[in-house]
Design a protein with these regions (language model features):
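Active-site-proximal beta-alpha core segment in soluble small-molecule metabolic enzymes
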Residues: 48-145
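Generic N-terminal amphipathic, Lys/Arg-enriched alpha-helix
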Residues: 3-22
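N-terminal glycine-rich anion-binding loops that anchor highly charged ligand groups
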Residues: 2-7, 26-57
Length: 145
């Protein structure tokens, strides 16, 4: 972490904390190393963007070989879809209440969207939210053993 300490020393007194500092070269090496390890084992990578919430980092991950991204909520999925991400998995079960159903339906117009579900009622509610085209939305059934 000498490189990190050098950067902190140079910035001392010039930035307010807390502040994110990303060492782009280190991050890129980590992305590439993770992807290489997974690819060597035949494992598809779908990173969770809730950690970084950064389109540029998501692009780097997909460019390195990730099959898509995982979002934590409809809003994250919308932001990444608007930035051109075409394969998104919503990891947390979503109940399509309020505006969520329409937002999910719109996402499926431009994005391969999959949503994790953990009960039959959620599947029915999501299908209803999709109107005449429930087949445009894919669901992943989550089983908690």
């Amino acid at each position: 972490m000498d490189q990190f300490q050098e950067i902190l020393d140079r910035l001392e007194g010039r930035i307010d904390t807390p502040v994110p500092i990303v060492l782009a070269d280190v991050m890129q090496r980590n992305i590439e190393r993770t992807q290489a390890m997974a690819s060597a084992r035949g494992i598809a990578v779908r990173p969770h963007v809730k950690t970084h919430k950064c389109i540029e980092i998501g692009r780097r991950q997909v460019d390195a070989g990730a099959i898509g991204i995982t979002a934590g909520n409809v809003g994250e999925a919308e932001v990444f879809a608007a930035a051109g991400f075409e394969d998104i998995f919503l990891a947390y079960p979503v109940w399509p209440s309020g505006t969520k159903g329409e937002r999910i339906r719109r996402l499926t117009e431009t994005t391969r969207l999959r949503i994790g579900v953990d009960n039959p009622a959620a599947v029915d509610a999501l299908a209803a939210a999709m109107g005449e085209e429930p087949e445009r939305l894919e669901v992943v059934v989550e089983i908690d053993c």
